[in-house]
């Protein structure tokens, strides 16, 4: 009897908590504001001179995408889709940058295994993910931010679906560039 009441109470509490939180994306923290300067950052990377700052891409559109972890199925699919469309982004003066809590060595191995040619940044302490409202405990959430050539945040994608996400970002980029 006690066990049944305990399970019922536990289930009720979990359901109530689930209903109080509108969606998992809200758990990542406060999102930066659209049409305001995007939070500046500098992080280690697997490419170039070893560090990348947002300001390095002044004059270009930036597709800044956060993802949970190298070598997981959804993250691998998302990265491969961005890579497949890389020339389309380049034709639109856009740079793709991936961010996760993985270290540089993991990013190097991930790029070697998947053929990804754009930079991946190592946000091992979550500081940049937190600044973008994309951090949940020990990893980044799957969020993407479109930043214009002047460093202004123009679009936020939450609840990303890896199989179609790159196409969605390209479509929105086209709208914003008109």
Predicted feature descriptions by range:
Residues 5, 17-40:
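N-proximal helix/coil linker or "cap" segments that precede and/or mark the start of modular domains
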Residues 74-114, 124-130:
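Structural microenvironment flanking redox-active thiols in thiol-disulfide oxidoreductases
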Residues 65-71, 101:
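Aromatic-flanked redox-active Cys/Sec active sites in thiol-based oxidoreductases
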Residues 140-178:
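Thiol-/selenol-based redox modules, centered on thioredoxin-like
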Residues 41-62:
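A short beta-strand-turn-helix
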Residues 39, 61, 141-143:
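Short loop/turn microsegments at loop-to-beta-strand junctions
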Residues 63-64, 96:
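Hydrophobic beta-strand anchors of alpha/beta hydrolase catalytic cores
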Residues 1-11:
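Bacterial N-terminal signal peptides that target proteins for export
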């Amino acid at each position: 009897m006690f066990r049944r009441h305990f399970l019922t109470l536990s289930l009720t509490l979990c359901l109530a908590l689930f209903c109080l939180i509108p969606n998992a994306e809200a758990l990542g923290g406060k999102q930066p504001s659209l049409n305001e300067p995007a939070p500046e950052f500098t992080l280690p990377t697997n490419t170039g001179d070893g560090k990348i700052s947002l300001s390095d891409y002044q004059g270009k559109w930036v597709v800044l995408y956060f993802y949970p972890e190298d070598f997981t199925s959804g993250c691998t699919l998302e990265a491969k889709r961005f890579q497949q469309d890389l020339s389309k982004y380049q034709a639109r003066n856009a740079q793709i940058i991936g961010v996760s809590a993985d270290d540089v060595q993991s990013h190097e191995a991930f790029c070697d295994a998947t053929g990804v040619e754009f930079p991946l940044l190592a946000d091992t302490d979550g500081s940049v993910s937190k600044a973008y409202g994309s951090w949940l405990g020990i990893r980044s959430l799957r969020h993407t931010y479109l930043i214009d050539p002047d460093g202004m945040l123009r679009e936020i994608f939450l609840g990303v679906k890896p199989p179609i996400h790159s196409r969605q970002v390209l479509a929105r980029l086209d709208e914003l560039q008109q």
